[in-house]
C-alpha cells in the first residue's frame, strides 16, 4: 500500500504568499496586509492539531481564489490619469473578459467620464456566461415510482 502524504504547511504558506504577490501586485498596502494576515493565521495554528489538514486545505483554496478571482482596479480620473487605488474586486468565477478587445471609441468614452482600469493578469479565470444561461435548461430524468433511482425511463 502506498502511504498518503500529509499536506505540507510550508508549501501551503508559500503558495499563499505567491498568490498574494500575483493578486496585489503594485498595491503595497494591500499586499502587506494580506501577507501579515496569512502570517498571523499560520503563527496562531503553529502546533499540529486534528484540524491541521483542514486548515492547510483552506489556505490552498484561499490562494487559488486570490490567483484566479481577485482583480486589482485603478480609478481613472477625467483627464486619464490614475487617481488612487481602491479595494480589490472579487469577480464572478465566470469572468466574461469584456475589458479585453474593446474598441477605441468605448475606451475613450470611459476615460473621458472617469472610470476604472482593471489589472487582469494571465491567471484570472475567464469564461463566458453561456454555461450559466443554460444551467437550468437540462432535461429532467423521469424516475418511475416504486423503482430505485438508478432505474430511469
Curated annotation (Swiss-Prot):
Its main location: mitochondrion. One of its GO terms (biological process) is mitochondrial respiratory chain complex III assembly. It is found in: Mitochondrion matrix. Keywords: Chaperone, Mitochondrion, Transit peptide. Residues 1-56 form a transit peptide. CDD domains: Complex1_LYR_LYRM7. Disulfide bonds: none annotated. GO terms for cellular component: mitochondrial matrix. GO terms for molecular function: protein folding chaperone. It comes from the Eukaryota. Belongs to the complex I LYR family. MZM1 subfamily. Assembly factor required for Rieske Fe-S protein RIP1 incorporation into the cytochrome b-c1 (CIII) complex. Functions as a chaperone, binding to this subunit within the mitochondrial matrix and stabilizing it prior to its translocation and insertion into the late CIII dimeric intermediate within the mitochondrial inner membrane. Modulates the mitochondrial matrix zinc pool. Interacts with RIP1. This is Mitochondrial zinc maintenance protein 1, mitochondrial. It comes from Ajellomyces capsulatus (strain NAm1 / WU24).
Amino acid at each position: 500500500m502506498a502511504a498518503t502524504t500529509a499536506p505540507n504547511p510550508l508549501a501551503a504558506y508559500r503558495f499563499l504568499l505567491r498568490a498574494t504577490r500575483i493578486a496585489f501586485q503594485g498595491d503595497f498596502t494591500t499586499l502587506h496586509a494580506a501577507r501579515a494576515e496569512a502570517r498571523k493565521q499560520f503563527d496562531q495554528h503553529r502546533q499540529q492539531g486534528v484540524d491541521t489538514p483542514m486548515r492547510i486545505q483552506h489556505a490552498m483554496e484561499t490562494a487559488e481564489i486570490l490567483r484566479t478571482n481577485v482583480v486589482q482596479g485603478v480609478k481613472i480620473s477625467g483627464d486619464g490619469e490614475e487617481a488612487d487605488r481602491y479595494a480589490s474586486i472579487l469577480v464572478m468565477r465566470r469572468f466574461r473578459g469584456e475589458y479585453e478587445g474593446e474598441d477605441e471609441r468605448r475606451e475613450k468614452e470611459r476615460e473621458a467620464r472617469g472610470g476604472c482600469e482593471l489589472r487582469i493578469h494571465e491567471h484570472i479565470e475567464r469564461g463566458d456566461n453561456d454555461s450559466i444561461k443554460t444551467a437550468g435548461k437540462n432535461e429532467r430524468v423521469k424516475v418511475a415510482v416504486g423503482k430505485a433511482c438508478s432505474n430511469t425511463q
